[in-house]
C-alpha cells in the first residue's frame, strides 16, 4: 500500500507539499498539484486522516470521556455526541474514566495527545484544580454533568439536588412520610447532591427520619437489590423509596416483590434518569428525567464552536430536571 512518502518521491516534491495538495491549500502551486495528483493516481493512493492533518491542523476527531461506555446512560451520551460530531464531519474517540482518578487522568491525556479538535469530558474523580489545568491547555474542552468554578461557561450540568428534591416532594404530597433513600456508594458529587435533595425535601416538610432510612449500593440493579434488602431487614415502616437511578429502582422493585410485597400498593418507588428500563419494567417507573442526550448535544456543539473560533458562542444552561409520572407511586390518601 502506497504511503504519502511514496507519493512525494514519485512527484518529486516534499511530504508537506503533498499534504497541501490533499488539503487543497492555496499555497500549493499548479505544477505541484498536477504532479501530486498524477502520482496519487498512479500509486492508487488514498489520503488518510494523518496526511490531511499535517496542513489543516485538524484531526477531525472529537474526544469524549465517560464513566463507562457499557452503562446505558453513557451510551446515550456517546450517541448524542456522535450525532453532532457526524453533522460536522467529525468522528469520536472515546475513553472510559470509571470514576477513578488515575483512569480519568489517563483518559483525558490520551484524548489530548491524540490531537482531538475538541473534547467533552465527564469526570467525577479528578479535582477542580486538575481539570482547570487541562482546560487551560485545551480551550475547546467542555465538561458535562459538572460545574467547575471559574469554568462555568464551559460546563453543561443538571441540577441533581433539585431532581432528588422533586422526587421526594412528590412522595410527600402523596401522603408518604416514611421515605427511604437508596443512594449510590460512589463518592461523586451526584451522590452527594441527590442525597442532599432528599434531605432538603424532608426538612421542608418537617419530616424527621433517622439515617437508618438511607442505604447505599452500587448504582446498578444489584446495588439497588442490596440497598433495598438492607432497608427491609430493619423492619422500618417504609412506604416509599427514592432511588439514586432507575437501575437501583429496578433492583428495589425486585426485592419488594421477592419479599411478598407489592409496588406501588405496599411501597412506592421513584427512580432517576428516565432511562429506557423505566418504560418497560413493571410497574412502569415514575422517575426524574435526566436529559443526557440534550446535554451531550449542547456540550459537543459548544466544544466544536470553541475549537473553530476560540470564543464562547453561547452560555450553556444548567438543565432543570423534570418529574415523569408513570405507575410506580400510589397515593396514601386513596
Whereabouts are the PLM-identified features?
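Flexible loop/hinge segments that line or gate small-molecule binding clefts
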Residues: 99, 118-166, 187, 247, ...
Amino acid at each position: 500500500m502506497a504511503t504519502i512518502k511514496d507519493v512525494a518521491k514519485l512527484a518529486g516534491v516534499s511530504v508537506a507539499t503533498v499534504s497541501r495538495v490533499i488539503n487543497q491549500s492555496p499555497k500549493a502551486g499548479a505544477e505541484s498539484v498536477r504532479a501530486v495528483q498524477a502520482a496519487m493516481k498512479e500509486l492508487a493512493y488514498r489520503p488518510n486522516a494523518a496526511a490531511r492533518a499535517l496542513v489543516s491542523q485538524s484531526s477531525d476527531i472529537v474526544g469524549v470521556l465517560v464513566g463507562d461506555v457499557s452503562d446505558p446512560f453513557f451510551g446515550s451520551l456517546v450517541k448524542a455526541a456522535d450525532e453532532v460530531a457526524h453533522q460536522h464531519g467529525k468522528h469520536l474517540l472515546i475513553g472510559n474514566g470509571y470514576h477513578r482518578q488515575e483512569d480519568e487522568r489517563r483518559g483525558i491525556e490520551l484524548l489530548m495527545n491524540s490531537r482531538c479538535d475538541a473534547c467533552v469530558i465527564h469526570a467525577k474523580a479528578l479535582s477542580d484544580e486538575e481539570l482547570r489545568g487541562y482546560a487551560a491547555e485545551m480551550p475547546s474542552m467542555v465538561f458535562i454533568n459538572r460545574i467547575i468554578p471559574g469554568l462555568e461557561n464551559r460546563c453543561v450540568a443538571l441540577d441533581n439536588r433539585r431532581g432528588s428534591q422533586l422526587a421526594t416532594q412528590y412522595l410527600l404530597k402523596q401522603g408518604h412520610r416514611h421515605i427511604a433513600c437508596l443512594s449510590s456508594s460512589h463518592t461523586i458529587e451526584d451522590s452527594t447532591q441527590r442525597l442532599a435533595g432528599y434531605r432538603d425535601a424532608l426538612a421542608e416538610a418537617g419530616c424527621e427520619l433517622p439515617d437508618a432510612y438511607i442505604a447505599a449500593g452500587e448504582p446498578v440493579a444489584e446495588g439497588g437489590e442490596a440497598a433495598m434488602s438492607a432497608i427491609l431487614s430493619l423492619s422500618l415502616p417504609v412506604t416509599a423509596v427514592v432511588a439514586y437511578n432507575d437501575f437501583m429502582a429496578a433492583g428495589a422493585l425486585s426485592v419488594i416483590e421477592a419479599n411478598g410485597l407489592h409496588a406501588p400498593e405496599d411501597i412506592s418507588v421513584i427512580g432517576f434518569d428516565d432511562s429506557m428500563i423505566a418504560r418497560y419494567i413493571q410497574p412502569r417507573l415514575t422517575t426524574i428525567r435526566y436529559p443526557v442526550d440534550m446535554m451531550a448535544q449542547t456540550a459537543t456543539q459548544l466544544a466544536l464552536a470553541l475549537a473553530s473560533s476560540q470564543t464562547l458562542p453561547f452560555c450553556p444552561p444548567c438543565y432543570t430536571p423534570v418529574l415523569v409520572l408513570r405507575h410506580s407511586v400510589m397515593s396514601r390518601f386513596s
